[in-house]
């Protein structure tokens, strides 16, 4: 190819890129090196072993994550720890409780600020996914959890008789919803966690008969898929106090897959941070184990793992020091929680979202609200029922570090998602949310 041809091709490309930027906004097309970050923003899971198995230090932001496993294996517990991590970093999380089984007291024990957590208990699968999409495109949500895919019942099935056959309805619903949700997640930096159950295929003689409901779309759209199982019961004497849990990363688009992590889940406590630190530090020589004794530097942590765990629980500075050494050894960033997504950038590039109405009782509200707060208005409002003068910001939760131009505090949130507009008009046809305090 001659030099003149090369120059003409370069000019034609620059002209095309300029036209695209004018029509769709700056950054609609960019070179890979411009778009690539030096690191991936993540949400810690609460288990340092699982953060390491994921390869990037936690659940990637702006992606879809699927967590599946048998009953009582720790799926919801894991997501509640992720919610607590987001809230400690000053972010906003939402929980779509399609199973109507969320326990606020248990969530509080795991470190979740239930006054700030947005909760929706939708009437149908369509309503749940529509609310999820509207929250994501509001550009104000950092993490949204859908519990669970199996409970997203299509409206046609709810309105039909008990014995009616509805072939493929849920799979088609999930496929359509994921096509819409995926683009919004990438533009806003929101992470969506789908909890899923297990089913068994009939007549399978070779390979695993286990499968997950909701069709195959979620398997393709998910950047990370986690298979979580109980492997043994933790006992003190004859009393069961928790479970040893194993998580296998069966799919990972951001790091090598098929790694495994094990950690302790204690009843009423959740994932034991201290037990995880002990296991990891012993494997890497940070904590020395002599017989049944655990020793860290000049400190004797205790005889037996339970005594060592209690020592770290009572001496937080020692636990923090061990954790920082592990993070440094593994190459994780010192700021484990990462930076919150640039919500202003999401506002500038967010796609056009028409005003939509969501009917029924599944409007979003906070867990501290009265039962009547859950009765949805037709516009699908987001309501936080705490008074702006009542209730302090929980310990360990910093102020919201979101760059969206809005007059809002962490104590009062009242947004009309369906017809919201922003003071600054974004590039293209995008619309955003103005939060009113």
Swiss-Prot record:
Bias type Polar residues, positions: 350-371, 380-391, 400-426
Keyword list, A-Z: ATP-binding, Cytoplasm, DNA damage, DNA recombination, DNA repair, DNA-binding, Nucleotide-binding, SOS response
Domain of life: Bacteria
Gene Ontology molecular function terms on file: ATP binding; ATP hydrolysis activity; ATP-dependent DNA damage sensor activity; damaged DNA binding; single-stranded DNA binding
Region described as Disordered: spans on this chain: 343-437
Single GO cellular component term: cytosol
Xref: PROSITE patterns: RECA_1, RECA_2, RECA_3
Keyword ATP-binding appears in the UniProt entry: yes
Official protein name in the record: Protein RecA
């Amino acid at each position: 190819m001659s030099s003149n041809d090369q120059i003409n091709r370069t000019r034609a490309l620059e002209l095309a890129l300029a036209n695209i930027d004018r029509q769709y906004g700056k950054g609609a097309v960019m070179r890979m090196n411009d778009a690539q970050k030096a690191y991936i923003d993540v949400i810690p899971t609460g288990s340092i072993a699982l953060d390491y198995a994921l390869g990037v230090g936690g659940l990637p932001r702006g992606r879809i994550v699927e967590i599946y496993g048998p009953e009582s294996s720790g799926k919801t517990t894991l997501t509640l720890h992720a919610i607590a991590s987001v809230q400690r970093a000053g972010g906003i999380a939402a929980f779509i409780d399609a199973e109507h089984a969320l326990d606020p007291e248990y969530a509080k024990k795991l470190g979740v600020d239930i006054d700030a957590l947005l909760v929706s208990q939708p009437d149908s699968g369509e309503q749940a996914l529509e609310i999820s999409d509207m929250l994501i495109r509001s550009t104000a949500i950092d993490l949204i959890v859908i519990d669970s895919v199996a409970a997203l019942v299509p409206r046609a099935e709810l309105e039909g008789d008990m014995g009616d056959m509805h072939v493929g309805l849920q799979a088609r619903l999930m496929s359509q919803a994921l096509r819409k949700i995926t683009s919004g997640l990438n533009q806003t930096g929101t992470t969506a966690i789908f909890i899923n159950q297990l089913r068994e295929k009939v007549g399978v003689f070779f390979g695993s008969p286990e499968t997950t409901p909701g069709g195959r779309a979620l398997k393709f759209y998910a950047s990370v898929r986690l298979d979580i199982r109980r492997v043994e019961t933790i006992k003190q004497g004859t009393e069961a106090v928790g479970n040893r849990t194993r998580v296998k990363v069966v799919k990972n688009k951001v790091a090598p897959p098929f790694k495994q992590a094990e950690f302790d889940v204690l009843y009423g406590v959740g994932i034991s941070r201290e037990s995880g630190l002990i296991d990891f530090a012993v494997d890497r020589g940070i904590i020395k184990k002599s017989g049944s004794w655990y020793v860290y530097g000049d400190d004797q942590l205790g005889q037996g793992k339970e005594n060592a765990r209690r020592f770290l629980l009572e001496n937080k500075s020692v636990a923090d020091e061990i954790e920082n050494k592990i993070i440094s050894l593994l190459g994780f960033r010192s700021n484990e929680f990462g930076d919150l997504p640039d919500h202003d950038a999401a506002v500038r590039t967010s796609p056009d979202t028409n005003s939509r109405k969501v009917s029924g009782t599944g409007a979003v509200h906070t867990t501290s609200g009265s039962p009547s707060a859950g009765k949805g208005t037709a516009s699908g409002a987001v309501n936080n029922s705490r008074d702006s003068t009542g209730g302090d910001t929980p310990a360990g939760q910093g102020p919201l570090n979101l760059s969206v131009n809005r007059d809002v505090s962490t104590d009062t949130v009242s947004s009309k998602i369906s017809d919201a507009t922003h003071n600054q008009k974004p590039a293209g046809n995008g619309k955003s949310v103005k939060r009113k305090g």
